[in-house]
């Protein structure tokens, strides 16, 4: 099931879920399976020419684009680059990563997103900005279930397969 709010439906139609979250409710059983980096992405023309955006503090002159479900990505990034008080010209929230990347490709601002979304997109109009800056996302992908669901063999097998798959990366 790929619908939103999968964690709230555990035990009510879902045996387990893979969720993107900062943390899990302690009443749930959870295993972090993957944690991504935050990338800054913009139109190629933003990093070219005499007015190129080349320094993190220049983000203050730009519109920042953030996925609505990953609202803390910009805060985590600005803290990591040592600019905790940096405020952009504007912040636009998107419900779709694909729409956010298209807006970035058209030069509407700088997208703050997870590395894996950019890797899957492959658009020559986009460039990773501030490539020398590595910032871990505050969000992780979690395997989650109600503790009693671990009594079900398919749930245990799925969990074990996920853990094995991502430990090899």
Language-model features, listed with the residues they occupy:
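Beta->alpha turn/N-cap motifs
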Residues: 3-4, 20-23, 42-44, 113-117
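Alpha-to-beta junction loops
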Residues: 12-19, 38, 104-110
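Ligand-binding "clamshell"
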Residues: 25-30, 34, 121-131
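Flexible hinge/capping segments at coil-to-helix
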Residues: 27-65
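Secondary-structure junction motif
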Residues: 63-82
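Hydrophobic hinge/microswitch elements
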Residues: 85-129, 136
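A late-sequence structural motif
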Residues: 132-169
